[in-house]
Structures are given as C-alpha cells and as structure tokens.
Regions:
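Ankyrin-repeat boundary/"N-cap" motif
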Residues: 6-18, 39-55, 74-81, 102-113, ...
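Ankyrin-repeat intra-repeat helix-capping/turn positions
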Residues: 22-23, 60, 84, 118, ...
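Alpha-helical protein-protein interaction modules
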Residues: 25-26, 36, 95-98, 104-108, ...
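Conserved ankyrin/ankyrin-like repeat signature
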Residues: 26, 63-64, 88, 121-122, ...
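Ankyrin repeat domain, specifically the short helix-to-loop turn at the C-terminus of the second helix
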Residues: 31-37, 66-73, 93-99, 124-132, ...
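Leucine-rich solenoid repeat scaffolds
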Residues: 53-60, 65, 69, 165-195
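A generic tandem-repeat structural signature
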Residues: 66-86
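Ankyrin-repeat and related helical/solenoid repeat scaffolds used for protein-protein interactions
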Residues: 136-179
C-alpha cells in the first residue's frame, strides 16, 4: 500500500510566504524541505492571496525574488519591475498595455513595485505607459530606501499624498527624519509634508 505525502499545511504555506518578505535563509531551508511550497499561495482573506515571490516583490527583496526565480517561480510584471528588468517590463507593456494596471500581492499596483528597482528611467516608463496608481505607496517606498532622486521625481510628477501614513502609522517625513535624511526631509517639507 502506497502512502501519499500530505501537501504543505496552511501554516507551512503562511510561514513560507512570510519568509518571502526578506528571510532568504528560511526560504532556502523551507524550499529544500518541501519544493511544493515554491508556488503555494497563502490566502490572507477572501480576495487576497500571496505567494513567496509576490511577497518578495512587494517589499523589494531582490535576493529572495532572484532565488525563487532560479527555482522556476513565475515571473510577473510586478516582480520584473521590482528587479529593474526594463526589457521584460517594456515587452509586457507592449504586449498588452493593460499590464500597466497590474497588481501584485494585496492589490499593490505596478508603480510602487517599480520604485524598489531604484531605476528612474523604468519608473518614468511605467508611469508614462499608464501605471499611475499607487503613487503614495511609491513615495513611502522611495523614502524608506532614501532615494532622493526618485522621491523628487514622484513629488514632481505622480502627485502622492505627502501626509499619508504607512502601515506603521508613519508619514514619509517621519521616516526621513528617523533616518536622518536631511535632503529628503527638506524636499518633503517643500511639498507640504508634516509628521
């Protein structure tokens, strides 16, 4: 009589997806123990699922995303944008202009994913091709990376809400102050930011 291996449990999938947000060692270990986790999707709520590579893409964890891609995880446009894969992103936008409205995990739009690439030309490309939603989250991402050039571009072009709070309840100005990034602090204040 053959015994069938049990599929990964919901808790294992959840743990793997959480690790995908940046814990490369845990991702490697868990995937070595059970390769079926690679494309397993955790359901956070009725309309919100996430895989480990989507987790990596939404937080800008390039090393985790690259590792998972080498294991044959699917490459979505949001992941390609986060990794700065301009040719791939441009190809997908040419193939179907509606890809500018693509979202990753938790419905996060393409623009905030692209900001993680820290590639101003790619950010401008996706924006000009229609990826205009998510400007406020994109600003939070750029501030958290301390990228003055991208913060300035977003403020000048994308119309983000400089007074919005991130998932930790912090405004972009608060984050810039905590990181002692005086150039970004001055820039945000010029655009009406408050703590």
């Amino acid at each position: 009589m053959q015994t069938q291996e049990r599929p990964p449990s919901t808790e294992q999938i959840r743990e793997f997806v959480i690790a995908g947000h940046g814990n490369i060692e845990k991702v490697r270990q868990m995937l070595a123990e059970d390769p079926r986790l690679l494309n397993a999707s955790y359901q956070w709520n009725e309309n919100d699922t996430e895989t480990a590579i989507q987790a990596a893409a939404q937080v800008g964890s390039a090393n985790v995303a690259q590792f998972l891609l080498k294991q044959d995880a699917p490459l979505e446009i949001c992941t390609a944008a986060m990794l700065g894969m301009r040719d791939e992103v441009e190809h997908r936008l040419d193939e179907d202009p509606r890809n500018a409205n693509a979202t990753g995990a938790h419905g996060i739009p393409l623009l905030p994913h692209t900001v993680w690439s820290e590639n101003p030309g790619l950010i401008q490309l996706v924006f000009e091709r229609g990826a205009k939603s998510g400007a406020t989250l994109a600003l939070h991402n750029a501030v958290s990376r301390g990228n003055h050039e991208i913060v300035k571009w977003l403020l000048d072009n994308a119309g983000p809400d400089v007074r919005s709070k991130n998932f930790q309840g912090k405004t972009p100005l608060t984050v810039a102050l905590e990181r002692s990034n005086d150039r970004i602090v001055a820039l945000l204040k010029q655009h009406g930011a408050i703590e």
